[in-house]
Amino acid sequence: IERVRTAWGVTIRDGFGQTETTCQIGNTPGQPVVPGSVGRPLPGYRVELVDHDDQPASEGEIVLPLSHRPLGLMQGYANNAKATADAMRNGYYHTSDVALRRDDGYFVYIGRTDDVFKSSDYRLSPFELESVLIEHEAIAEAAVVPSSDPLRLSVPKAFVTVRQGYEAGPELARAVFLFSREKLAPYKRIRRLQFSELPKTISGKIRRVELRRLELERTPQPARLPGEYWEEDFA
């Protein structure tokens, strides 16, 4: 945000929304922009967070109470009553996205409910780890998924593509692991890395589900794959 403001004199204002809801949360003009936050609920939207039992939580799934139905919320999915019922249940519209709410009312996006995973009993957000990785000058894109581990049950593994002018290999892998160590808490560090093209949807979104499936299918872990490196290799 600061780099864009310095270079071009404009302010990036992150927000959160869906096709089903339009924009629900945003860093609007007139309030401070908090880096790393998607902002506060927009006028006309009552946004709440709930746990797995649909109980109020400070960190959990983003939901919209149907008792305060906003004008921007869809009526339902066309010709798909089951999908509509799944999304609109227990008095809420469920987004399947996870966030935490700060004391000042700003929301911090964590990730999709099916992307968040546990490592050593800590809940990890792929979105947060990927955001750190792409700050490295050599990384063009990144996708983080859980990789099976006998000690921690799972550890963060990053699939990354490299920017033009950089060469994928052990030296770059070492540099990325060091970068991860400097930027992330020990339990969040990238422990495994693979240089690879990333599967995407027709709209260009990374299909983490395919990468997760690849990791599950190779459990228990065999020898290193081509282009794959583990942090312990550089100890």
Region locations from a protein language model:
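Conserved AMP-binding/adenylate-forming
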Residues: 1-15, 19-106, 112-116, 129-130
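Hydrophobic/anchoring residues in structured secondary elements
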Residues: 144, 192-195
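AMP-binding/adenylate-forming catalytic core of the ANL superfamily
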Residues: 17, 70, 83, 98-187, ...
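A short, polar/charged loop-to-alpha-helix boundary motif
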Residues: 71-74, 214-227
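Phosphate-coordinating loops and pocket residues in cytosolic domains that bind phosphorylated ligands
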Residues: 79, 89-90, 135, 213, ...
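Active-site and channel-lining beta-strand-loop segments
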Residues: 46-52, 196-203
